[in-house]
A protein has these predicted regions:
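Beta-strand-rich binding/interaction modules
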Residues: 585-614
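Hydrophobic h-region of N-terminal signal peptides that target proteins for export
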Residues: 11-18
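Alpha-helical packing segments of well-folded alpha/beta enzyme cores
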Residues: 67, 111, 115, 236-247, ...
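Conserved alpha/beta catalytic core and glycan-binding cleft of carbohydrate-active enzymes
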Residues: 137-178, 277, 281-461, 466-469
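Acidic/aromatic-lined carbohydrate-recognition and catalytic surfaces
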Residues: 20-238, 249, 256, 260-309, ...
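Loop/helix patches that line or flank the sugar-binding groove of alpha-linked glycan CAZymes
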Residues: 37, 287, 307, 345-349, ...
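Positively charged n-region of N-terminal signal peptides that target proteins for export
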Residues: 1-4
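C-terminal beta-strand-rich structural cap/linker in extracellular carbohydrate-active enzymes
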Residues: 621-640
């Protein structure tokens, strides 16, 4: 037990780090952002898949308007939309053709303004996705930049008459051999085929030429590398502000910025990208106070020092939370903390096929997984607590949902969402509140699948009811954006998948079976995952200890990593969260840990009471918690 006490005291002592500037940080002190971020949950909506109002098979703004009462019922503070702007639709809207106009498939600018007004009437903020780093190759800026004689836009992009090295040549040669090379991410350069120079610099797909924000320490032997203060990069920076201002003037409350850390090239110490975003933040604070900038960065010490209000804990391959959710590399090399088997090594992929033995990590333990994440997360939160917030996501459009593989029952998902929704600032991906599943073998719609990574399975239509297309659209199933929860039929499926199919799976031809994963089937069921989600969000609003600016204090036991236990406190109130995602009962005594916590913080005020519980969980807490027992797949939230 002594090890646990020491861990808590070290975390408490770490609070002094909050006042220290982060590495590469700035002397400017940023406000953390508007008050709604403190107790808020942000709801992410992939607009093509949420609700179709006109029967064409693609979700739209008027469809979202029709479901604002439902979104309000969740208790969320804001909606974040994936890109709504006019797009070439090679990469799900992230190849923008016009930043100033809503794509006609979603409606009009006036429709979006109406949505914003009606959302505001319900106390819900609206945030848009800003693709700041690149455009579509069909964007007028790029087409004019590609002309020999154009002057205004000639340096909005990065052009060269030669490739920088052999590797770039090999990458381009390999990419062009791909029949679908426009959706190939290999390398950084693309053959232009335009009147001017032979090659342009791309960010992701070939259809996404990088905007020119300049290079840090440009190489004089590389004439395409302009400094950040060259006329082209300065003009692009002004365009960025103009786009933000245009939508703020229409009522938008903030932006989530795509690839926020990579706008300036060759910026290893992030000095220039921090300067860029500080300039934007100072301009925004002066002209549009109380608006929010949220980044896809994954490093809050840099992100928040750059002036962002929120950074996101990413579920990417190297993300620290991936070991808790999905394993390090798409369930390829070890165990998963939030699993029935207690973090045993993953031996199969998502299709149920066995992994080769040499790819299975049999050395990493659940304690290793949890300790790694606790160390990372507490450092991120404590060292940036004066600057902004670090958000925890349930899933998103690029990564797996939490309902994946053998983690597929409502009970398991309640435990998972208990973790996410008691963290400092949660972002809830649409459909996760009802347990929608990550699917495989989905069609590659609009660049969703690339390099062996299937993103389409997390973008399937919202499942509203048991009607045609799960209530998403009245269209023919042949015209739907993505299939609605098709039957799970791969060979060698897990037994859990077969059980899931029988109990939860959708039927064929765009219909859903009674009792399936839908809003309709869960709305009035007090024991449903949907209502558990609502209860957790309501609990956040009622208890300041769970707010974004309250402390997160892990209780770690190397010999007994289950149940997961942590404290949230605001100095006035303290809440203990204990979660057991495994198939076995788990017991833990916390008397010495709680005593240490009380001594250091005076954080336990008496009136100990359970606030929420799922599964079979019991405790004995008076002056301390000397007996905490959690049955299989259970969790409890206790006010201390």
């Amino acid at each position: 037990m002594r090890r646990i006490v020491i861990a808590i005291i070290l975390v408490l002592a770490g609070a002094t780090l909050a006042a220290q500037p982060a590495q590469g940080s700035f002397t400017q002190t940023w406000t953390k952002g508007p008050d709604w971020l403190r107790d808020g949950v942000i709801y992410q909506v992939y607009p093509s898949s949420y609700k179709d109002s006109d029967g064409n098979g693609i979700g739209d703004i008027r469809g979202v308007i029709s479901e604002l009462d439902y979104i309000e019922s969740l208790g969320v503070r804001a909606i974040w939309f994936n890109p709504l702007f006019v797009s070439g639709w090679i990469d799900g809207g992230y190849d923008v053709i016009d930043f100033y106009r809503v794509d006609p498939r979603f409606g009009t600018n006036n429709d979006l303004v109406e949505l914003i007004r009606k959302a505001h009437d319900k106390g819900i903020k609206v945030m848009l996705d800003l693709v700041a780093g690149h455009t579509s190759d069909k964007h007028p800026w790029f087409l004019q930049s590609a002309e020999d004689t154009n002057l205004q836009y000639s340096d909005y992009y990065i052009w060269s008459d030669r490739l920088p090295d052999k590797k770039a040549e090999q990458d381009l040669e390999t990419m062009l051999k791909d029949p679908d090379y426009m959706q190939n991410t290999l390398g950084k350069w693309m053959k232009s085929g335009y009147p001017r120079d032979k090659y342009y610099y791309k960010n992701f797909y070939a259809c996404q030429p990088a905007l020119n924000y300049g290079f840090a320490n440009p190489d004089p032997d590389h004439p395409w590398e302009q400094g950040v203060d060259a006329p082209g990069p300065r003009a692009v920076r002004q365009e960025l502000k103009d786009i933000i201002a245009f939508w703020y003037d229409k009522g938008v409350d903030g932006f989530r910025v795509d690839m926020a850390s990579s706008l300036v090239k060759n910026d290893k110490d992030k000095k220039e990208i921090l300067n860029l975003w500080r300039e934007v933040r100072e301009w925004s604070d002066k002209n549009y106070p109380d608006h929010v900038l949220m980044a896809e960065w994954g490093s809050p010490k840099y992100c928040l020092a750059a002036g962002y209000n929120v950074d996101m804990d990413l579920n990417n391959t190297n993300g620290h939370n991936r070991r808790l959710y999905f394993d390090r590399k798409h369930q390829a090399d070890g165990g998963v903390y939030f699993s029935l088997d207690g973090g045993q090594p993953s031996v199969r992929d998502l299709y149920g096929n066995p992994w080769p033995e040499d790819k299975i990590d049999r050395t990493t333990t659940p304690a290793d997984m949890l300790k790694e994440y606790y160390d990372y997360f507490t450092d991120c939160v404590e060292s940036t607590s004066e600057m902004g917030y670090f958000a925890t996501i349930s899933g998103n459009h690029d990564h797996l949902r939490i309902n994946v593989g053998p983690r597929n029952t409502p009970e398991q998902l309640k435990v998972m969402l208990s973790w996410i929704l008691t963290m400092p600032l949660p972002i809830l991906y649409y459909g996760d509140e009802i347990g929608m599943r990550s699917l495989v073998d989905m069609p590659n719609v609009e660049g969703a699948n690339h390099n062996g990574k299937e993103r389409a399975g997390a973008r399937t239509p919202m499942q509203w009811n048991s009607g045609v297309n799960a209530g998403f659209s009245t269209c023919s199933p042949d015209d739907i954006y993505l299939p609605v929860c098709p039957e799970w039929t791969p060979a060698n499926s897990y037994p859990q998948y077969l059980a899931w199919k029988n109990e939860y799976a959708c039927g064929r031809a765009g219909t859903t079976a009674p009792g399936n994963i839908t809003v309709e089937s869960q709305d009035d069921d007090p024991n449903s995952l949907l209502n558990w989600t609502r209860s957790l969000i309501a609990l956040r609003k009622e208890h300041g200890a769970l707010w974004a600016d309250s402390r997160f204090i892990p209780i770690f036991n190397a010999e007994n990593p289950y149940p997961m236990v942590y404290l949230r406190t605001d100095g006035e109130e303290s809440i203990l969260v204990a979660l057991n995602p495994t198939a076995e009962s788990r017991k833990l005594s916390l008397s010495s840990e709680i005593s240490a916590f009380r001594h250091e913080t005076a954080g336990m005020k008496g009136n100990v009471a359970p606030l929420l519980s799922t599964g079979k969980a019991s405790y004995r807490c008076t002056s301390s918690c000397d007996n905490l027992t959690l049955g299989p797949v259970s969790g409890i939230v206790i006010r201390l």
